[in-house]
Amino acid sequence: MTGTTLDVREIPPAERHPRIHEAFADLESGDALTLINDHEPKPLFYEMEAEVEAFDADGYTVERRGPDEFVATFPKR
């Protein structure tokens, strides 16, 4: 699986979800978006699960690497 890594920690909060959705849309089927965030992206997970048909929710993973660093993988079907 290949894909894109997007570190959103320095992006203003109001701009994060649109940028994430754009990056995800640019992926090929079978690729994944790796997201680095300052909090667990659970609201984004639920948003993607409800709104993005190509999101493979079963393949989603998240790892806390530090107090302000979460790395989540959003695979695309």
Go through the PLM ranges and name each one.
Residues 1, 28, 55, 65-67:
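A generic structural signal for short, non-catalytic loop/turn and secondary-structure boundary residues
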Residues 1-29:
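An N-terminal amphipathic alpha-helical segment
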Residues 3, 30-34, 69-71:
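Intrinsic-disorder/low-complexity, polar/charged segments enriched in Ser/Thr/Lys/Arg/Asp/Glu/Gln
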Residues 12-17, 33, 50, 68:
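A generic structural micro-environment signature
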Residues 24-59:
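Short, hydrophobic/π-rich interface segment
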Residues 57-77:
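C-terminal edge-of-domain segments
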